[in-house]
């Protein structure tokens, strides 16, 4: 176990931001912390990084209280925070990388193959010798991620890591994060609002609403908590246009949904479509539907599936 968060409370100006927050983070997992804007996600990350102190409760890293570890803790963790300037605007991209390499006291230098590969993967080669004060938001995010990814830290905190990135860069980043977890056995803790990122990466999910944990458990169980009407979808080869079927057509395939597999099958037989059927599958609730469910349960019992 990497982290144990026990009964954490945090207040600002007599307002409670986090209340009785408790959960555990396991090694080599990707944990996604979900919540609306202002739910307390970034405050929680800052507490786990030791940047601010809790008013009540304890945070343990490998069984030791953060308050007792001291500066050596930061040899084990690295972070990119959305609300914090992670780089120096008056330095070039290259100079920022060299500066943070020096702080980390690693044996590698700027010309290391892995660092050069990251620069190319995130399309920063043409701007790497320019002052980062002129970078776009997406470029700054990419540079911050390169600096974070090049450390030997066991734990990586990523606060809204794909914010400001285009689709292709987001996809590349997700692949890199997954690789870090599976191949380099890093523990990754991230916050995100983007459903596709959550679907691609989450092993474990923590949902915070109004400063309290309303769900904690693995990703598949997270989706299964929603009481919903069963829905089935048939995928049919070709573009089928018929008013009764109410098809959704995409990339040469037609998609038909019904609440019963018997109803769906009967409809396909009626319209002589069984020979064109690719598959029928039961649909799971989306991330958005699941979050809406938990938000609607405010004031109820915390859900926990370990």
Question: What are the language-model segments listed below?
Answer:
Residues 156-160:
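Catalytic Walker B motif of ABC-type/P-loop ATPase nucleotide-binding domains
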Residues 57-68, 72-74:
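Conserved ABC transporter NBD signature motif
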């Amino acid at each position: 176990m990497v982290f144990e968060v026990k009964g954490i409370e945090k207040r600002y100006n007599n307002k409670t931001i986090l209340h009785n927050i408790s959960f555990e983070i396991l090694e080599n997992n990707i944990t996604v912390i979900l919540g609306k804007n202002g739910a307390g996600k970034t405050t929680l990350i800052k507490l786990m990084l030791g940047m601010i102190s809790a008013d009540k409760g304890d945070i343990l890293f490998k069984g030791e209280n953060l308050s007792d570890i001291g500066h050596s803790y930061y040899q084990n963790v690295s972070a990119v925070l959305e609300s914090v300037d992670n780089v120096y605007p008056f330095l070039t991209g290259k100079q920022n990388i060299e500066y943070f390499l020096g702080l980390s006291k690693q044996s590698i230098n700027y010309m290391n193959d892995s660092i050069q590969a990251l620069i190319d993967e995130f399309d920063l080669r043409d701007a790497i010798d320019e002052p980062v004060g002129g970078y776009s938001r997406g470029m700054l995010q990419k540079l911050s991620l390169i600096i974070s990814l090049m450390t030997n830290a066991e734990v990586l905190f990523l606060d809204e890591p794909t914010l400001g990135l285009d689709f292709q860069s987001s996809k590349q980043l997700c692949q890199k994060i997954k690789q870090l977890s599976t191949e380099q056995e890093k523990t990754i803790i991230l916050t995100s609002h983007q459903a596709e990122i959550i679907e691609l990466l989450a092993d474990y999910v923590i949902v915070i609403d109004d400063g309290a944990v309303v769900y904690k458990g693995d990703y598949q169980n997270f989706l299964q908590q929603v009481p919903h009407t069963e829905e089935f979808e048939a995928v049919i080869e070709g573009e089928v246009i018929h008013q009764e079927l109410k098809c959704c057509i995409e990339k040469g395939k037609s998609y038909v949904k019904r609440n019963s597999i018997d109803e769906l099958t009967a409809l396909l037989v009626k319209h002589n479509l069984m020979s064109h059927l690719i598959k029928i599958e039961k649909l799971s609730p989306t991330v958005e539907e699941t979050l809406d469910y938990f938000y609607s349960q405010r004031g109820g019992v915390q859900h926990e599936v370990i």
